[in-house]
A protein has these predicted regions:
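Helix-coil boundary/capping segments in enzymes
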Residues: 1-149
Length: 149
């Protein structure tokens, strides 16, 4: 029997790369602190306690093997949907994250599958991004936050 982790959130490498360069990422700002630090944005103060939020795909695979997990369904970590952004920035965030998830899946298709994030600021933009994510990137669906606005 295969073990599938359907609750496998990903904190985008593009976010960590921006923070390493002392830049904000789509309105999110990094503050050093215990664990992996704090990320503020969208009206929220998020404490990232686990070192796993910075895992590379290779580290994620090692962790999966150690836990006996065969497949992970990757989706954006919930604080980072970016619903607080304007339509254009929300669309850019979604596209960046979806491309990162798709690249991870392409590199390890037997171990990962992916769910898109959508720019819910605008319904037609969200529909277009879902279509792109599924038909062009090969993602399996989308994850939405419980609160869009």
């Amino acid at each position: 029997m295969r073990t599938i982790d359907i609750h496998a959130h990903l904190v985008p490498r593009s976010m960590w790369n921006a923070f390493d360069a002392k830049k904000d990422w789509y309105g999110f700002h990094f503050e050093p602190g215990p664990g992996a630090g704090y990320v503020n944005g969208g009206g929220a103060h998020n404490h990232l306690t686990s070192p796993k939020v910075k895992f590379t795909p290779e580290e994620r695979l090692k962790d999966m093997d150690a836990q006996g997990v065969d497949i992970q369904v990757l989706s954006i970590h919930t604080p980072f949907f970016g619903y607080h952004l304007d339509k254009k920035e929300g669309q850019a965030l979604a596209r960046d994250v979806n491309q990162e998830i798709a690249a991870t899946v392409r590199d390890n298709p037997k171990r990962f599958c992916g769910m898109a994030t959508l720019p819910m600021q605008d319904v037609s933009t969200a529909i277009a991004e879902l279509e792109h994510a599924v038909t062009k990137l090969g993602l399996k669906g989308a994850e939405l936050d419980t609160q869009v606005n």
